[in-house]
């Protein structure tokens, strides 16, 4: 009984801020979302989906390396992955602008190729990947580390290459943890505000549009977009969680 009461208390603490949506309704005074809100939803969902493809393709090999390797280079790589998670997101946005801005060396290189990395869809993708990639790598590394390497070695004795052994044995066995990693990265990507505010204020995603609505229209104006944010972001984590429990 005491344990159940404690768990209910924790859940109530987490749910308390969300009760504001019930008190104010998903739609403020019965009004609909503005065209800018709908554009922000599309930007976040499309940009977030593309970013997740990049994150999984780039982050999974890195997570495998961190989980299966040893040595000082691994410690250095882990530090590099953790550093973006330890810094304020506004500071990360400023640093990205310094490196990829139009007057920076890398910014000029991409600019010569016709790719602007500030206030463009490409900049939104860059900021989203940079925000969510470390979260995915850390979670995926933990999931892969739980799979005994003996299974990979057994597959290699049966003729698999190291790559095929990881692809056919390790990753399927780590699928529950990898599903959690994808869910965390998805939520992190769609909820990022600080980096995108500096690097990709336009086109605005949902977090930046929420901030703009508060500035222009007041606190009550954000409830429609907050409700849509939850409706847009929750299905993927819930679906992945159900699939992970079903297998």
Q: Where in this protein do the model-derived segments appear?
A:
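Membrane-helix/interface signature in polytopic inner-membrane proteins
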Residues: 141-152, 162
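Hydrophobic positions on the alpha-helical face of helix-turn-helix-like DNA-binding modules
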Residues: 154-155, 165, 210
